[in-house]
Amino acid sequence: MNLPETIGEWALADFPVTYDRETIFDYINGAGEVYRSYAFKGVQVGRYQEAGGGELNVEVFDMGTTEDAYGVFSYAREEERRGIGAAFESRGSVLCFWQDRFYVCVAEEPGTDAPDSALEQMARGLSQGLPPGGERPALVDALPEEGLVPNSQRFFHTHQSLNYHYYLARENVLNLGTENDAVLARYRAGPSTLLLVDYREESKASEALTSFRDQITGGIEAAEPRSGAFVASRQEGSYLIVVLESASGEASEALLNSAATRLQTLRR
């Protein structure tokens, strides 16, 4: 996407700058790896001004796929609203949304006097210039619905991302990488934390299951290795189901069974 020269009363103040997978660190150093853990292609950055003195900074990330646009949106979101893009979140002076393969953020420049409606106006204008739609990853929709904590779903690929959301181990015991999909979510019952991973091949799921059980649960399906929190795992075709934290063996077993039933609709 090329940023439009004007959106409503807002006009580009500078020529937009584009960063790719290699130069992203010139723009956002520490957070660059978050985007690179997805199929990130590049980001276009622009600054808009309006006559009243308001100033907005715009970032349009091309995440490569609609699934990864959702993934980076889900990475740290606390709420999810409809009406801009596929979904959006507004926190203070920042509004972010995802749509098709794009993840977009609009931020008010500190110290400027932008109208209260400016963020949504700019976001809607940008949304109109993007391809419509956006489907959540099928793996996210395979999460059991009963007891799911709203907006707790995190879609990602790598071991580093898993440890950011839920620290499992220093080693990559689940053999996670950019070639697989993973989703993590919290549940009220227990409470519990559930991880689903799609390895795309049964043999790879089997290898990951063996590695996880050998290093975390002593080679068995379920155990209590973490200060009263039950951990359990099971393979369902090319998928791995892991209950990372639950208050009881019964709760972890129930969540395993529920997830297995949901995943059967996705079996390759």
Give the residues covered by each predicted segment.
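Soluble, non-membrane globular domain cores that form compact, hydrophobic packing
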Residues: 1-268
